């Protein structure tokens, strides 16, 4: 065995030699500070760069309850790498968490992100974070911190992973938990912008089988752009709706589709019966169904099928809620009703 080289004979190593570029990390921070600054709102104490981010809960809350959520973008990132398209996945990241905490009535207050890669590409990372900031602006929350982890050997060059963390607040007396949902209530469906951020393992399998030209026109934009459309953020229109109407329950339609997410807000003994003809199946989902040979039941269990958020209100409030959401720029339909469950029946059925 050769003895180890003595320190005087060995060439000195640096962090850069090990694959970590501190200068690139500093350059990224400089690039993203203006994006984060645009998201600042009341409650933010201090700026980016501290060990911890500080936020003061708004004084309008008498009994504030903090609501937190965390999520990623899933294998939609694999398609982003393939297309070298990184400007929309940041909004996806924010949407997945803020829409989740919104369903309990929470106003998103702040957001943090985690960006992990093997080798940091400053331009790519800055593009992603700009999208995160855009999402935060749409949600009305502050991007108050984050972590960029350059970890040589952990990820292939050109690839990265994302995680996001949102914290919001709701008045204790106004928490929405589905406990008041009753027979006869109406289920409203708000349109999605596309696939959002779930089901992309199946999407990628369908693309592999169909081998389409992703640059080809698809209803006025490229198929690639249709597939990568960022997840819609429903925060502002739904917070406004909650100010005027008693929203009984909401479900963010993510992994599991309509049939597995709506039951999360229903009490035992209740079923949401959805009419699949009450809203149009968007062309992109028709394309996926056709080229993947995907059964209807599987479509409803994997994809949002055009509905990104379900909102449950009383029958008396349904028309008013429809009107308010439409006035706020949302496409919305009455997609079903709540009734008593039949023996052995699932809590959400699509007929």
Swiss-Prot record:
One GO cellular component term of this record is:
cytosol
Compartment annotation = Cytoplasm
Q: Name one Pfam family in it.
A: AIRS
MF terms from GO for this chain are: ATP binding; phosphoribosylamine-glycine ligase activity; phosphoribosylformylglycinamidine cyclo-ligase activity
A GO biological process of this protein is: 'de novo' IMP biosynthetic process
Tell me which InterPro entries the record gives. PurM-like_C_dom (IPR010918), PurM-like_C_sf (IPR036676), PurM-like_N (IPR016188), PurM-like_N_sf (IPR036921), PurM_cligase (IPR004733)
Query: What keywords appear on the UniProt entry?
Result: ATP-binding, Cytoplasm, Ligase, Nucleotide-binding, Purine biosynthesis
Q: Which reaction does it catalyse?
A: 2-formamido-N(1)-(5-O-phospho-beta-D-ribosyl)acetamidine + ATP = 5-amino-1-(5-phospho-beta-D-ribosyl)imidazole + ADP + phosphate + H(+)
Q: What is its EC number?
A: 6.3.3.1
* Functional pathway: Purine metabolism; IMP biosynthesis via de novo pathway; 5-amino-1-(5-phospho-D-ribosyl)imidazole from N(2)-formyl-N(1)-(5-phospho-D-ribosyl)glycinamide: step 2/2
Q: Which HAMAP family match?
A: AIRS
Q: Which family does it belong to?
A: Belongs to the AIR synthase family.
What's this protein's name? Phosphoribosylformylglycinamidine cyclo-ligase
Q: In the UniProt record, what gene is named as encoding this protein?
A: purM
């Amino acid at each position: 065995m050769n003895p180890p080289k003595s320190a005087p004979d060995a060439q000195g190593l640096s962090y850069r030699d090990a694959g970590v570029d501190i200068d690139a990390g500093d350059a990224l921070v400089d690039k993203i500070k203006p994006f984060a600054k645009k998201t600042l709102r009341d409650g933010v104490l201090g700026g980016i760069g501290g060990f911890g981010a500080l936020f003061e809960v708004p004084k309008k809350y008498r009994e504030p309850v903090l609501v937190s959520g965390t999520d990623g973008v899933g294998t939609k990132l694999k398609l982003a790498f393939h297309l070298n398209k990184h400007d929309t996945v940041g909004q996806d990241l924010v949407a997945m968490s803020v829409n989740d905490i919104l369903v309990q009535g929470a106003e998103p207050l702040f957001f943090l992100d985690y960006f992990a890669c093997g080798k940091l590409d400053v331009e790519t990372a800055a593009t992603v974070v700009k999208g995160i900031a855009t999402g935060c602006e749409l949600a009305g929350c502050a991007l108050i911190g984050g972590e960029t982890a350059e970890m040589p050997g952990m990820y292939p060059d050109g690839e990265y992973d994302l995680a996001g963390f949102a914290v919001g607040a709701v008045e204790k007396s106004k928490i929405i938990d589905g406990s008041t949902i009753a027979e006869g209530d109406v289920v409203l469906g708000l349109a999605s912008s596309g696939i959002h951020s779930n089901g992309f393992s199946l999407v990628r399998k369908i693309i592999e089988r169909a081998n389409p030209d992703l640059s080809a026109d698809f209803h006025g934009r490229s198929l690639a752009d249709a597939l990568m459309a960022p997840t819609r953020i429903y925060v502002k229109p739904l917070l406004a709706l909650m100010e005027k109407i008693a929203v009984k329950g909401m479900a963010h339609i993510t992994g599991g589709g309509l049939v597995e997410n709506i039951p999360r807000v229903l009490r035992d003994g209740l079923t949401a019966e959805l009419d699949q003809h009450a809203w149009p199946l968007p062309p992109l989902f028709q394309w996926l169904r056709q080229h993947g040979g995907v059964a209807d039941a599987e479509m409803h269990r994997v994809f949002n099928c055009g509905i990104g958020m379900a909102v449950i209100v009383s029958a008396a409030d349904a028309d008013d809620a429809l009107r308010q959401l439409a006035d706020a720029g949302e496409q919305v339909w009455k997609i079903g009703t709540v009734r008593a469950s039949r023996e052995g029946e699932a809590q959400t059925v699509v007929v």
